[in-house]
Amino acid sequence: MKYQGKSTRKATGGRLRLNRSKRKFELGRDFTIPVIGAQKLKVLNVTGNGSKVRVLKSDVVNVTDPKTGKTQKVKMTTVTENPANKNYVRRNFLTKGTFVTTELGKARITNRPGQDGCINAVLVA
C-alpha cells in the first residue's frame, strides 16, 4: 500500500507536524503490470461497495482492424516493442502503447490492462 497524503517533510527538509493521523482513504495500491500467459484476473473491492477487475496474466487480446472496423478476440504470442521501457519487452509486460505480435499481425495496445480487466488493441499495418 502506498500513502498518497501530504508529506511529513518540507521542501527544505524540515519536519512538518500533521494536524491529524493518516486515513485509510489516503492509501493507494501498487501498480500491477500484466504479462503474457494463461488468463488470470484479480477482483479488487473499492470504496463505495464497488469492484475493479485487474489483468495479471492474459494471452488473448481484442484486436480491431481500423480498415474494416471489425473486432476479433485473438491470441498474442510476444511483445515486440514497448515505448514505456525497453526492458519490458524482455519480460513480456503489457502496458498502454505496447506493440504485440498476434495471429492477425502486429497490434498496438490502446487501453491500460492493469486497470481495465481486458486488453484492447488496434491492428498496425
Curated annotation (Swiss-Prot):
Pfam families: Ribosomal_S8e (PF01201). GO terms for molecular function: structural constituent of ribosome. The keyword Ribosomal protein applies. GO terms for cellular component: ribonucleoprotein complex; ribosome. Keywords: Ribonucleoprotein, Ribosomal protein. This is Small ribosomal subunit protein eS8. The gene is rps8e. PANTHER family: 40S RIBOSOMAL PROTEIN S8. One of its GO terms (biological process) is translation. The keyword Ribonucleoprotein applies.
